[in-house]
Amino acid sequence: MTHPEREAGGMMTTSYLSFPPSTTVKETLEKFRQEAANVDLVYYVYVTDDEERLLGVVTLRDLILADQDKKLEELMDERVISVKLDDKEDTIAEHFAKYAVTAIPVVDENERMQGTIMFKNLLEVVAPHLGQ
């Protein structure tokens, strides 16, 4: 399904890293190294259940500094800011401004991960329309 360019679904990339909550830091970093070339810029790893429902987020900084044997469920922040597939650019821009994040996960109506929007993706869509 294609989404309009000025909605979250049209701005998102489907290139992101997600892991089950029981994954260790060591396992996450190993997978990150394997997948790094295939993934856009990574600021966060997303913690999802077996149906890809978004449970939490771990910053790359927290991941690097954590004990290798810790599980993501011990590190994750459950207060995840997300947008829906059909959210418009103004809502997305407000989220970036209000929460000072570098990427926002995009979820469907069942809270399942669909992709992420990086701030640069928002700018690419909004910049051509500034001053109109």
Give, region by region, the residue ranges found by the protein language model.
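Cytosolic regulatory modules rich in charged/polar residues
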Residues: 1-132
